[in-house]
Curated annotation (Swiss-Prot):
Pfam families attached to this UniProt entry: COX2, COX2_TM
Segments traversing the membrane: 26-47, 63-84
Species of the source: Strongylocentrotus purpuratus
SUPFAM superfamilies from the UniProt entry: Cupredoxins, Cytochrome c oxidase subunit II-like, transmembrane region
Subunit structure: Component of the cytochrome c oxidase (complex IV, CIV), a multisubunit enzyme composed of a catalytic core of 3 subunits and several supernumerary subunits. The complex exists as a monomer or a dimer and forms supercomplexes (SCs) in the inner mitochondrial membrane with ubiquinol-cytochrome c oxidoreductase (cytochrome b-c1 complex, complex III, CIII).
Keywords of the record: Copper, Electron transport, Magnesium, Membrane, Metal-binding, Mitochondrion, Mitochondrion inner membrane, Respiratory chain, Translocase, Transmembrane, Transmembrane helix, Transport
Required co-factors: Cu cation
Positions annotated to bind Cu cation A1: 161, 196, 200, 207
Metal-binding recorded as keyword: yes
Gene name for this UniProt entry: COII
Enzyme Commission number(s): 7.1.1.9
Residues that coordinate or bind Mg(2+): 198
Name of the featured protein: Cytochrome c oxidase subunit 2
Length: 229
């Protein structure tokens, strides 16, 4: 979960988010080196008193500043293409969830079970219990088994929404009349918070997402108890 004055990314709770964090750091190093090189070139030109009115071309220099940027772009593109493939690939998901965005709450359906669906509303500030985050807690959490690939089918019942949980490295737009899908793999137990990431109206800021990742036997007990109720 994000905290006050946090400058970095949230702690990764899935293998995909770990890879995204590594790629972010790698790309940031490359961009920092490019910035230093460009700044050095600008300063060198500004302070240099050497001029040549008859210097019209430089084939070697033009080749260098064409080839080197191309190589840099390739070095950035290859890891990103791998990540795009990992984000898009769905290999035999253990569980499929339908998530529908509404103004201004989420509704969930466990497609592998009969009659297992519910709405998830934000808990008002006046009702938040001690220790739970303000504006992020919900009345019904999305309970899922840890260390299993989960597929989420995302859509909307009214306007554009976006289902996003940063610590799991997942974000998918909820478009009316269209069914998008995303996958994630919670590597550990815990409670992971997200929010609608597409401006959807007056209460856009008040439709959080809460995923509770639990061991499989705990998940089985939760499903049994919910269906009995």
């Amino acid at each position: 979960m994000g905290t006050w004055a946090q400058f970095g990314l949230q702690d990764a709770s899935s293998p995909l988010m770990e890879e995204l964090t590594y790629f972010h750091d790698y790309a940031l190093i490359v961009l920092t080196l490019i910035t230093i090189l460009v700044f050095y070139g600008l300063v060198s030109l500004l302070v240099s008193s050497n001029t040549n009115r008859f210097f019209f071309e430089g084939q070697e220099l033009e080749t260098i500043w064409t080839v080197i940027p191309a190589l840099i772009l390739i070095l950035i593109a290859l890891p990103s293409l791998q990540l795009l493939y990992l984000m898009d690939e769905v290999n035999d998901p253990f569980l499929t969830i339908k998530a529908f965005g509404h103004q201004w709450y989420w509704s969930y359906e466990y497609t592998d079970f009969n009659d297992l669906e519910f709405d998830s509303y934000m808990v008002p500030t006046s009702d938040v219990s001690f220790g739970n985050p303000r504006l992020l807690e919900v009345d019904n959490r999305l309970v899922l088994p840890m260390q299993n690939p989960i597929r989420v089918l995302v859509s909307s019942a009214d306007v554009l929404h976006s289902w996003a949980v940063p610590s799991l490295g997942t974000k998918m737009d909820a478009v009316p009349g269209r069914l998008n899908q995303t996958t994630f793999f919670a590597a550990r137990t815990g409670v992971f918070y997200g929010q609608c990431s597409e401006i959807c109206g007056a209460n856009h800021s008040f439709m959080p997402i809460v995923i509770e990742s639990v061991p499989f036997n705990t998940f089985e007990n939760w499903v049994t108890q919910y269906l009995e109720e």
